[in-house]
A protein has these predicted regions:
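Conserved catalytic-core motifs of GNAT/GCN5-like acyltransferases
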Residues: 135, 153-167
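Conserved GNAT acetyl-CoA-binding A-motif
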Residues: 125-135
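Conserved active-site alpha-helix within GNAT-family acetyltransferase domains
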Residues: 140-156
């Protein structure tokens, strides 16, 4: 069984690389639009906030709880966002994919489905995950639609799961894909990616 991370995962359009402190400036540039952070629990819009965000991610990786990535666009080598494995449970082989964000010019295209494909393929096929979860704010209908389009199943709602930056209480919706569902999800995702790019993911 391969390690879940840290690892580099390469597709046809993007590459996921382990997130490090050297990426701070590129991440700050990619994340400078405030609308990116509307539904996120952290908003690293300054150099100091980004450094703190990266430090927390590094600590979580060192503890084996999370494996954060930067998303690099292959056509120009530009960092266009971030995603990560979190809630890593080695003994049970379960993991969550989350903390995903992209610069606005990467919204609505091939970037997110390819990133999720790379992460899920590695989790299920190399790490032998039995369950991959995805969560989002109950009010984030765009994210929910994107998760459903991946083929994930709705599991339920966690009430008052966290407090938003504005002080309101957040209900979190939970989706998942389990081991037995992955082959079908994979085929549909590969077709979607091939239709979008004209080549294999």
């Amino acid at each position: 069984m391969a390690a879940l991370g840290p690892i580099t995962l390469r597709g046809t359009h993007i590459q996921l690389e382990p997130m490090r402190s050297v990426h701070a400036e590129a991440l700050l540039e990619a994340g400078r639009s405030p609308e990116i952070w509307e539904w996120m629990p952290a908003r690293p819009l300054t150099a100091e906030a980004m450094d703190a965000w990266l430090a927390r991610a590094s600590q979580a990786e060192a503890q084996g709880h999370e494996y954060p990535f930067v998303v690099v666009r292959l056509t120009d080598g530009r960092v266009i966002g971030s995603t990560r494995y979190l809630e890593v449970h080695e003994d049970d082989r379960t993991v969550e994919i989350g903390w995903t964000w992209y610069t606005p010019d990467a919204w609505g295209g091939i970037v997110n489905p390819q990133a999720k494909y790379l992460l899920m393929r590695h989790a299920f096929e190399d790490w032998h995950a039995i369950r991959v979860a995805l969560k989002t704010d109950v009010k984030n209908v765009h994210s929910q639609a994107a998760i459903k389009k991946l083929g994930a199943r709705f599991e339920g709602t966690m009430r008052n799961q966290r407090i938003r930056p504005d002080g309101t209480y957040r209900d979190t919706v939970v989706f998942s894909i389990i081991e037995s569902e992955w082959p079908g999800v994979k085929l549909r995702l590969e077709k979607r990616l091939a239709d979008a790019s004209g080549q294999q993911p």
